[in-house]
């Protein structure tokens, strides 16, 4: 078991690493040549200009103003000065609420830490139990935990009381935060400027119709069922193959630019490359001519694929983005069932255009359930197969236990320096390496499930990552570490003593998690602000690919908050804090340092660096709240299991109401606040519509929305929001091919070969009829009389 010296060595290594990263960042950010790496957000907003312009050769690369080096740490107070309303306007509500999670950790754990150190640490330290257990490995750190309290001792009343205090305080803080974030979201939606997703719904599983194409069928359905609010629609094309060609052509363009720049710098000889994969083997050819011909071939293939998509009816998917004249009409459509058959004409709020994950719109709806079932099974096996490397990592953290099984390693293990490095540093860094490859796997699994927005993919990946951390990193570290450490004791002692050994050993894993917090939460956060990889990539691109100022702008990689990995990682720290607050309070100060340090770092990154891929209006908060409740319930269950091994089982029954009350609290919060994150109140929608009509009476919504949800490959390089045109276009009658079946006396007088449906001209007289549509839906048909 890691001792105080081991933890001290680990703390020294990680603190030195963190300070080294911070010092390097403070120096690098001051250099003009790195300005686009450490302040890209201001460049994207057009506020900041390049400091390398109008300077001498030396000052373009190095900052020679010594006064700036004196204030090299001024980025910290600057990160804290921007008020929250300004932060929301500058970076978006998603980023502002994400920062609040770190602040939530401080609000929750600072009072708990003070109380735990004032009450539980003296109770645990004076227990004097570990010395009386034979063949048990422990250190002075473990004497601060509940393991040092003798079984059946009345001292456990302090721990039981503390668990109730932690539960009520945590629930209070979570309630206040949920309420605050819900109000922030409602204010954000009320004050938000017009966006295409406010007026658009995504319609999926459009049923086939023998008389009409998908395009006509969608238009008919919404003209009839939403006659006063339907405006226009955009059907979804399967353009995945075309998107791959566009990506290949972009990659070829980068290589062509590289060789053209190389030729400009050295015009005496033309650059060459090889025709094999990556240019490493094959016939040597002229590089510029080779990539130019590649570009021409891909351009021809793109043109053929575009023509195929536009002319092939099979390329049109049974889905569409349908836009409405008002937010009120959009809310009604998005939040109601469109047909008596609940499996067709499925509507949901459309993600904003940059949030759409276009690849998954081409997946047939009937495949989604099968895909999600298979993904769930695959996730189950992934979680439990990952226990193998986790067990190996834990073996590194329990070398004393290995000595009992592999005594020939004892001479090496007993070397003081080797032992301290391995136990205090290696387990945390090894576990971190294993976890690096995991997010990519989980995101791929979420994409296979078929979700249609980047924000929802992040939320689903975060859910998978959270459960992976719970099972493998937390429970796996405790179970495998405990079993390996006490293997010999388990084989020699009576079966009735095994629960006692497990109960005593679980708190002793706090030392491992302390090392992990220092590696991931201290040094890892400091490495985040240094941005080593974006720094190197920017300078490589700037050297070999940049020809114009626009190229230099594209070479910047501002990055973004990766909710799929960062959220579960934060919640893991919440779990550790809640579990060990009443078990081993020594862990709490390390968690507080993490939350405080991460709050400053990520606030700086959000203000100066990150450019989010989408804005969901903090729609992920119910997931954050739910997972924190799960962490709280896990801590309660583990505390009950732990006390049941301490000859305190009868009194432990007093803890049974805790998880029940916590679940009731979760249900109450869900009923009270969750609708604010999934539905748009009709009252608020009407208010925004009324204000918009009063302030912009001539707004042409159809022009504003017509290109908003066109696949980006059909837009070229322009994926910006379409401009607002103030001149209203006329809306002609829509000619259809629908023939009447089961007609009434009104529509029997209408022409059966071709009918028209008024879309916008509400003054035209109408005749109404019904048609038995696909899957038995009765569709009312409107005709010009």
From Swiss-Prot:
GO molecular function: calcium-activated cation channel activity
Main location group: membrane
Pfam families xrefs: PHM7_cyt (PF14703), RSN1_7TM (PF02714), RSN1_TM (PF13967)
Domain of life: Eukaryota
Bias type Polar residues, positions: 739-761
Keywords: Calcium, Immunity, Innate immunity, Ion channel, Ion transport, Membrane, Phosphoprotein, Plant defense, Transmembrane, Transmembrane helix, Transport
Keyword Transmembrane attributed: yes
Record function comment: Calcium-permeable channel involved in plant stomatal immunity.
Family from the record: Belongs to the CSC1 (TC 1.A.17) family.
Compartment(s) of residence: Membrane
Membrane topology label: Multi-pass membrane protein
Underlying gene: OSCA1.7
Species of origin: Arabidopsis thaliana (Mouse-ear cress)
This protein's name: Hyperosmolality-gated Ca2+ permeable channel 1.7
Modified residues (Phosphoserine): 54
């Amino acid at each position: 078991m890691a001792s105080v010296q081991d933890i001290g060595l680990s703390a020294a290594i990680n603190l030195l690493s963190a300070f080294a990263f911070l010092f390097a960042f403070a120096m690098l950010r001051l250099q003009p040549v790195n300005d686009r790496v450490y302040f890209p957000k201001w460049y994207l907003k057009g506020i900041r200009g390049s400091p390398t312009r109008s300077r001498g050769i030396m000052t373009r690369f190095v900052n020679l103003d010594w006064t700036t080096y004196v204030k090299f740490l001024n980025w910290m107070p600057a990160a804290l000065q921007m008020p929250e309303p300004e932060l929301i306007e500058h970076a978006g509500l998603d980023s502002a609420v994400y920062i609040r999670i770190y602040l939530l950790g401080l609000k929750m754990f600072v009072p708990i830490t003070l109380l735990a150190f004032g009450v539980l640490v003296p109770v645990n330290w004076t227990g004097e139990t570990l010395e009386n257990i034979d063949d048990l490995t422990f250190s002075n750190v473990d004497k601060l935990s509940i393991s040092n309290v003798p079984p059946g001792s009345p001292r456990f009343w302090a721990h039981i009381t503390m668990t109730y205090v932690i539960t009520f305080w945590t629930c209070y803080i979570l309630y206040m935060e949920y309420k605050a974030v819900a109000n922030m979201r409602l204010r954000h939606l009320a004050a938000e400027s017009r966006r295409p997703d406010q007026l658009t719904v995504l319609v999926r599983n459009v049923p086939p119709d023998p008389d009409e194409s998908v395009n006509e069928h969608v238009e008919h359905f919404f003209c009839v069922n939403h006659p006063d609010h339907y405006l226009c629609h955009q059907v979804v094309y399967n353009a995945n193959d075309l998107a791959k060609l566009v990506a290949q052509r972009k990659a070829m363009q980068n290589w062509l630019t590289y060789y053209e720049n190389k030729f400009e710098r050295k015009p005496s000889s033309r650059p060459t490359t090889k025709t094999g994969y990556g240019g490493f083997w094959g016939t040597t050819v002229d590089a510029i001519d080779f990539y130019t011909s590649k570009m021409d071939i891909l351009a021809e293939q793109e043109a053929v694929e575009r023509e195929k998509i536009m002319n092939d009816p099979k390329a049109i998917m049974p889905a569409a983005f349908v836009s409405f004249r008002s937010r009120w009409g959009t809310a009604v459509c998005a939040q109601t069932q469109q047909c008596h058959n609940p499996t067709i004409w499925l509507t949901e709020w459309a993600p904003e255009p940059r949030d759409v994950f276009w690849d998954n719109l081409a997946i047939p709806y009937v495949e989604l359930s099968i895909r999600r079932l298979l993904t769930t099974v695959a996730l189950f096996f992934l979680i439990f197969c990952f226990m193998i490397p986790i067990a190996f990592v834990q073996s590194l953290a329990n070398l004393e236990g290995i000595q009992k099984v592999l005594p020939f390693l004892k001479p090496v293990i007993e070397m003081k320096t080797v032992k301290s490095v391995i136990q205090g540093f290696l387990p945390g860094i090894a576990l971190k390496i294993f976890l690096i490859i995991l997010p990519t796997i989980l995101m791929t699994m979420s994409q296979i499930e078929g979700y249609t927005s980047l924000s929802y993919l992040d939320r689903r990946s975060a859910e998978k990552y959270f459960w992976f951390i719970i099972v493998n990193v937390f429970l796996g570290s405790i179970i495998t570490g405990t079993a390996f450490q006490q293997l010999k004791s388990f084989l020699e002692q009576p079966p009735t003593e095994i629960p006692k050994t497990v109960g005593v050993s679980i708190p002793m894993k706090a030392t491992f998690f302390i090392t992990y917090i220092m590696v991931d939460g201290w040094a890892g956060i400091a490495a985040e602000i240094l941005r080593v990889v974006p720094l190197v990539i920017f300078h490589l691109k700037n050297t070999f690919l940049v020809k114009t100022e626009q190229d230099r702008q594209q070479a910047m990689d501002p990055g973004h908050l990766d909710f799929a990995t960062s959220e579960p990682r934060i919640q893991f720290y919440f779990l550790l804090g809640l579990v060990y607050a009443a078990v081993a309070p020594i862990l709490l100060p390390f968690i507080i340092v993490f939350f405080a340090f991460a709050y400053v770092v990520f606030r700086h990154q959000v203000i100066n660096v990150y450019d989010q891929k989408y804005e969901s209006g903090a729609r992920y908060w119910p997931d954050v709240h739910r997972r924190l409740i799960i962490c709280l319930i896990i801590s309660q269950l583990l505390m009950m299991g732990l006390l049941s091994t301490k000859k305190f089982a009868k009194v432990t029954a007093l803890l049974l109401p805790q998880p029940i009350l916590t679940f009731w609290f979760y249900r109450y919060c869900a009923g009270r606040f969750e609708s604010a994150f999934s539905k748009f109140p009709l009252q608020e929608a009407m208010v925004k519509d009324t204000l918009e009509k009063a302030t912009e009476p001539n707004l042409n919504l159809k022009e504003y929305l017509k290109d908003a949800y066109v696949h980006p490959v059909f837009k070229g390089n322009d994926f910006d929001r379409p401009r607002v045109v103030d001149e209203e276009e006329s809306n002609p009658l829509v000619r259809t091919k629908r023939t009447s079946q089961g007609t009434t006396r009104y529509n029997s007088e209408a022409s059966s070969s071709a009918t028209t449906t008024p879309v916008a001209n509400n003054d035209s007289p109408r005749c109404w009829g019904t048609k038995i549509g696909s899957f038995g839906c009765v569709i009312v048909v409107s005709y010009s009389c």
